[in-house]
């Protein structure tokens, strides 16, 4: 099922489907006591292959020229209110700058979103996209606390997760509602049992403080930063806490920092419905006949009927699992993150209508961090833990039922699914921090804020809200008229020029710039 504020979202979620190369970095716990953590020296080594629990596979391929990706572990306080207490290990990855050392600016730190996404996994998979930026920066990313090898949150085991992600997430009667809440409580109880020591310390404010420690340990006077999706929220919180330490920063696929978890979920309902509308329009406007229907209305009605039928009669998926209504919905949402994956969605739906749910199940597995061997990463456990630690609101069954009409109006297809996702923090062991993050950053330098008009997961309005919330003279708004979650990865020349010009040469784009 979706987690509360489902999911705030993953910038690389859709692309992750066809990526088999992941990696892990060493992490660990320790005892700081009187150690000055800002003076620690990182022990960079060639990155190892990931553990089975992180998806398996091989170590990342060498960089152009033969250099290897380097991994290290940074010690950080477990509890930032007790900086001399116990420590945790924060896993880092780096690609050293490829250009002349005399032109090196420093480190460029990436967060690719989630919350719960592994930067140590994602950066090497997409490193070639940032080759130009690497000419003047060391490219650096990390597993935020609670993610992957950085004291990764552990909840249920793989077998239990198979059941959890197959459950009915859109209950139709009291018995189904009760079962849904019971399953959520059991999952959350397992998180507390297995990771209770860490749960109070995975808030976004904690991760932001880790980034400032990272800045110091990397030897940079300022934090140069590229945040995508949830990474924009993390970057905004950093700018609020450390405005004078912000260097050149870019936010892409921007979370609306003014919204509550409920408002964010409702915004996603509208965003994914828009993406579905655009998908149906794209399919039916092609020269060839759309295999899903003759008109946009036909396409959407057939999908709705298909999902309704799955509620009572699942079809074969990836043996031994069937494709349930929840898995199919999750798979469709996954494919709507990127226009590049619309052909897979078309094929997946076409085959599912004939009784073969394997493609949609694969898409759902990708969203949930499940590999072909049935091993789950901790991306969803971390997503829930971070969201529930951040978001103060807790939503009862009765409250969600009252809000269903608004969600259904926003998205006839996805409204129920996203509304019931708000139950994800029921009986969570840690109190949420706030209704929404503080990102006001008076005194910070310009931050480039890019919004896609067709972004389903972080709707365009979020970029405008972030630019305003950062403060006058800080948020520099750039609009990309296009589909998908994230603008830089679209390879749009206008967007690339705006971002590269700022990060490499300090040229601030004109606020209000529109790229299409």
Positions of PLM-derived features:
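Alpha/beta-hydrolase fold active-site neighborhood
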Residues: 300-444
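Short beta-strand/loop motif that positions the catalytic acidic residue
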Residues: 443, 448-451, 455
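Alpha/beta-hydrolase fold nucleophile elbow
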Residues: 220-230
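A catalytic-pocket lid/entrance helix-loop region that shapes and gates access to the active site
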Residues: 154-168, 239-302, 347-362, 366-371
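Catalytic-loop region of hydrolases
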Residues: 2-14, 24-169, 208, 297, ...
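Conserved alpha/beta-hydrolase "acid-adjacent" motif
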Residues: 456-462
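Catalytic histidine neighborhood in serine/cysteine hydrolases
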Residues: 92, 471-486
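Catalytic histidine-centered segment of alpha/beta-hydrolase-like enzymes
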Residues: 483-495
């Amino acid at each position: 099922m979706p987690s509360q504020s489902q999911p705030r979202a993953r910038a690389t979620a859709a692309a992750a489907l066809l990526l088999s190369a992941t990696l892990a970095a060493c992490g660990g716990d320790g005892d700081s006591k009187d150690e000055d953590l800002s003076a620690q020296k990182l022990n960079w080594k060639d990155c190892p292959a990931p553990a089975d629990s992180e998806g398996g596979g091989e170590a990342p391929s060498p960089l152009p020229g033969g250099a290897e990706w380097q991994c290290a572990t940074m010690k950080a306080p477990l509890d930032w209110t007790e900086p001399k207490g116990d420590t945790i290990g924060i896993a880092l990855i780096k690609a050293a700058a490829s250009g002349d050392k005399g032109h090196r600016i420093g480190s460029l730190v990436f967060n690719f979103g989630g919350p719960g996404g592994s930067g140590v996994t994602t950066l090497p998979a997409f490193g070639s996209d940032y080759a130009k930026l690497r000419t003047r920066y060391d490219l650096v990313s990390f597993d935020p606390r609670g993610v992957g090898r950085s004291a990764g949150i552990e909840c249920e085991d793989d077998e239990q997760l198979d059941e959890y992600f197959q459950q009915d997430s859109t209950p139709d009667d009291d018995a189904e509602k009760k079962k849904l809440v019971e399953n959520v409580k059991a999952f959350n109880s397992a998180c507390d049992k297995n990771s209770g020591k860490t749960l109070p310390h995975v808030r976004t404010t904690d991760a932001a403080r880790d980034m400032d420690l990272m800045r110091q340990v990397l030897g940079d006077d300022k934090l140069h930063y590229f945040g995508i999706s949830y990474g924009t929220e993390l970057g905004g919180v950093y700018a609020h806490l450390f405005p004078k330490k912000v260097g050149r920063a870019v936010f892409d696929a921007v979370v609306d920092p003014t919204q509550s978890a409920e408002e964010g979920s409702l915004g996603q309902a509208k965003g994914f419905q828009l993406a579905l509308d655009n998908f149906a329009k794209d399919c039916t406007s092609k020269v060839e006949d759309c295999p899903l229907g003759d008109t946009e209305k036909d396409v959407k009605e057939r999908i709705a009927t298909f999902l309704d039928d799955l509620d009572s009669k699942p079809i074969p998926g990836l043996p031994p699992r069937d494709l349930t209504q929840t898995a199919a919905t999750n798979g469709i949402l996954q494919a709507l993150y990127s226009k590049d994956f619309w052909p897979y969605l078309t094929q997946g739906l076409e085959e599912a209508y004939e009784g073969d749910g394997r493609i949609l199940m694969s898409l759902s597995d990708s969203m949930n961090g499940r590999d072909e061997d049935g091993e789950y990463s901790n991306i969803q456990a971390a997503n829930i833990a971070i969201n529930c630690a951040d978001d103060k609101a807790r939503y009862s069954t009765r409250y969600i039922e009252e809000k269903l009409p608004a969600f259904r109006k926003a998205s006839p297809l996805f409204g129920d699914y996203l509304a019931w996702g708000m139950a994800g923090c029921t009986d969570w062991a840690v109190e949420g921090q706030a209704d929404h993050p503080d990102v006001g950053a008076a005194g910070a330098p310009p931050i480039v804020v890019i919004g896609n008009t067709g972004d389903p997961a972080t709707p365009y309005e979020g970029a405008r809200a972030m630019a305003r919330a950062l403060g006058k003279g800080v948020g520099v708004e750039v609009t990309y008229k296009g589909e998908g979650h994230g603008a830089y990865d679209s390879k749009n020349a206008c967007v690339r020029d705006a971002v590269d010009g700022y990060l490499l040469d300090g040229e601030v784009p004109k606020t209000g710039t529109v790229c299409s």
